[in-house]
């Protein structure tokens, strides 16, 4: 294709998106691009001779009066048809624009366009693989392309043309090895989108040399491993606050926090607690003193609540340190192996048959690998569970790697282990910390626990595990059918083709048969021994005492050992069989049937082993070790046909576990929390942490809550414990609509359950009064991390976020990213969960009051965390609205009210007063 090929970048605005002949074009815009420059533009409004729907008018800003005297499509079709001849058709979502335009041209008598086409959505996904959104508006913001009038075709076409030029520039920067690999996969893309890779290769006069930081192995080009300088290197020593940048505000409470932290790092107790409320600058408050201590050879492990907050800590907070320090800080992020890509496995998927969508994902991954230093798949913002490819390429730990692979020495998990030895800061999350703390025993680090109020919850949750005995049986059955099938391709065919020996097959088959036959026997005996089969409750849960489960396993020890031996055999055999599979693949000895059978076997057998991962918990020696710390119970939904028997394991208390399995491996432990604690919740908190003897520092907020915020407590909301869930969802939906109609500002509603999020979302989505709003719902319209990024990129239309889980704590939404916070329900944990029932019963048996001792302090702490999402800077202003009347009408409600920051006005109102109160607050001046 000639260098001066013309690209016609087209955007349409239409009366609707359905291509059933009922909709019409109301604006056509085209921008011509040659040699990476805009050379011409064409734009026209079009009279559709039909009403323009209100939502289209609101979105595009094109009203019926604007098109009343515009030409008909018949009048401009000839011009459009001629304009597009001998061009490459480009659009952002080409499937819509090209097909819609063709349909309209044919409708008025013109032949169908026969043009090559390029889709800028797919190109953007490939070349900018880490973006959270590929909407044109979000892309233009991320790439800093001016976009003055989103959803108007002339503006969108110009922006798409500039985006196309950026994409061509990106392609021009790609190394030859990567470019050739992308070209070879280009047929999987829409239309002729892959032609841009071919064009670039054809136009290159010589090979483009690799960036010195890149290396090519096989079909993959990736970044070379980072080399950290020795952490004990001589670093110029300077006073803690000497290099304070002039652009960074000095906050008195933050400076006091830094001085206290520095003092405690040098001379403090083994465990110290810092209560630093929002606005104190908590994170920098411990990072800068820690960085200062690096000059004296100290090293740190920093743990926060979630992967999302872990990413935020690295991307935002750690990067700020460069402004304060005369040296570079070495940082490593640690997550579970499932977050990382296995290069060897990914390389083999490139040689396997794939559908077009999977090829697109592979192309994104290939580009990403030239950018990432970590191999952390979270960087890609994928919804991993929606991508079958990720089942094949995610890491399963260093122990499962093929040491003969050319990728072994470059493996990201192995790199991470090496980097960790010289890392100044190791950043992780609480879930990883409690499982892997022992790995830091010889590194003499100080442990910093950020969002410490969540460490206990995470500890208990991660020790709460389930083994579904019926699911094990189902998987074993499925696997045996796949292996022994007489009517379809089976392992017998693999043996005939000499892809597997008969001896190997028989051994594998025999072990799976052991599981298939023994687990149901064990399950039935357990059901008969421990469950009272009364068809009353939907789900019956029965706690199991240590003596009884120990005696049961002892009676059935032969069954237990049979299954345990089968598990161990499969755990050892599967990696070897997988390596054999890869060898056969490399030798091109597998046809599609044998390839698919091997893949099915590995998928099912790995799922089976995952279901049995907790089987060793039942070993007699393990039961004895955990007798005083482990809770066990059975659940069985008796009223259901085909009910599953599930065995649950839970940690009884967190204190001893944390002292033994976490704190003991570090020189010192510093706890930080941004929550407001009452005297009752603080005592509960430190007791659960097992840090009773710790020293306590407390700081004042820097915010003027009297003028920056206000709390509204709705006293006539229905009692959540007295009304059905659907009725309460109706009430919440009505109130949220009222709140949204009273203000068009970024609004977040915090829920306790995903189920209620879905119920409310379903009602709001279909309500005409919510048309101006973009509604985001956690786990409905996206993952927490994805929705957070969307919510943070403030749109021209107001956004409503329905959230739960991680949004209760640690998410930073300053300024106009969040102005109205709604708490749908006080955040009590579900009392009906068997785990909580056992905790509460145990407290009651010890003479306590479970509600006051456990349920209430946990809910109050979580409520305080939620309220803390609203005001994040001294310039923020916002409302917090509580739609749970218990905060007013129950005696314990005062404990929730006491967590509002000092000085924040609190007003009790009725539902009908909401609109007036909201309007008055936002109309008033500070």
Go through each PLM region and give its residues.
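Walker A/P-loop
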Residues: 267-288
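Acidic, Mg2+-coordinating catalytic module of metal-dependent nucleases/exonucleases
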Residues: 85-105, 131, 135-197, 880
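A substrate-engagement module of RecA-like helicase motors
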Residues: 237-238, 298, 307-422
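Acidic two-metal-ion nuclease catalytic site recognized across multiple nuclease folds
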Residues: 1-2, 166-236
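Conserved coupling segment at the C-terminus of the helicase ATP-binding
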Residues: 223-231, 239-240, 336-388, 443-445, ...
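Conserved non-catalytic scaffold segment of RNase H-like nuclease domains
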Residues: 2-116, 129-151
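Conserved RecA-like P-loop NTPase helicase motor core
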Residues: 715-724, 783-884
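Conserved motor-coupling elements within RecA-like helicase/translocase cores
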Residues: 416-423, 768-801
